[in-house]
Amino acid sequence: MKKLLIIYPHWIPSNLVGVQRARLIANFLPRHGWHPIIVAVHPDYYTEPLVTELTKTVNADVEVHWCKARKKSRFLPVGDIALRGFSQLVGKAVNVIKDEAPDFIWSPLPSFYTSLVCRRVHEITGVPYGLDYMDPWVHDFPGARFPNKAWFAKRAAMLLEPIAAKKVSLLTGVTSLSYQPVIDRNPHLQGISTGYMPLGFDPSDYRLKPDNTRLLWDGDGDVIPIIYAGAFLPEAHYYIDVLFAVIAEMRRAGKLDQRLRLYFVGTGRGNLDPVSKYAERHGISDIVTEHAERISYLEVLHNLSQSFGVLAIGNRERHYTASKIFQTILSGQRVFPMFHCESTVVGILQESKADNFLVKYNPSIPEREFKNIVARYFAEFINPNNPWAPNLSALDKYSADYSAAKLVRLIEKALCDKRN
């Protein structure tokens, strides 16, 4: 059996979204003739809360090697664990390669600095490596102005990405739009093995029960709960602003069930206004609850499955794929999605017949017309008499099993290209 070394600084029991990419691929690699080996920083050095129940989601044949890192402190105010554990990740990966002789190295991004770890390990060992872009590294950071952090982040990305990608043998991503700009900026990469795989899903995750089965709306009485789970991204603010304006107007017109409640969880704490601020602005803060902190991945699945419906809010960028779309559809509850009309999510929703209430954003549509579209589909979404019967079998080709199989094919092509 061939071996894939996955270098990713976080690993279970981390509750970060990026860990799911590495976990889902690793769980299914053995089905396709590859043994997964993980190199990660030990959880003792994470700054985020740990969720031990997530160990239930990792298959027993996934091999994990831990390394140390420098701890974040007032003397080292660096949050990114790939930076704090850079030399340790390199050292551990090199030792694993000496002992296990893996055939290929692969790393999901972000953390983007892990790409530099891979480049360094390749320089030392000669083992070819691939980078997996879940998000673009070089892009226009919201609010980037000299000399703020966002401005420096973009400049750092522009400087470091060519170094990280210089000798890469494979580029993958959740969509081709994630990695194609890397090739455009680095023309010498033309012709290397490339391909995209969705984050996908593992159906067995939905059979696992969280340790905490309490629902977000427990204690709120007789309510109709609608949930949004995930980060509140900068480009999603426009959607929330329009949606809340629509809900406020429906309420004033007496067209909103008084039991309707919206619960936002895991939205994070960014520099822009939180969801709660938009709710206040539109006068609906009494029916909107925001929990900025994350809850366990298994708790999210449990809450989604018990809700009336799920909000799937994307952003106004066409490359955005919303990996969480699978968990929303598989929740068994109706979904209200808002995405750019060219996002790959639109095709997934249409194929699975989960597009009953789909709002497609088109930059050419006037704002008033877009608001009317949102109002029409949201009214249909909250009407329990409207049908909801997605074709879940259509999602099979987006499963983590399928993604792992495709990754294996791409790696084997990259290895073949390198031999030739």
Regions found by a protein language model. Give the residues of each.
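Carbohydrate-associated surface elements
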Residues: L177, G200
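Acceptor-binding helix/loop patch of EC 2.4 sugar-transfer enzymes
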Residues: P9, R70-P77, D99-E100, T125-P162
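N-terminal subdomain of nucleotide-sugar transferases
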Residues: M1-K68, A404, E412, C416-N420
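Nucleotide-activated donor-binding/catalytic signature segment of Leloir-type glycosyltransferases, i.e.
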Residues: R259, Y263-G268, L272-E299
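Conserved donor-binding/catalytic core segment of Leloir-type glycosyltransferases
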Residues: L5, W217-H237, F244-A245, S403
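Acidic donor-binding loop of glycosyltransferase active sites
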Residues: S169, H302-H319
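A charged, aromatic-enriched C-terminal amphipathic alpha-helix characteristic of glycosyltransferases
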Residues: Y361-A375, A379-K413
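Membrane-proximal helix-turn-helix segments that form the acceptor-binding/catalytic region
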Residues: Y113-L116, R120-I124, W151-L171
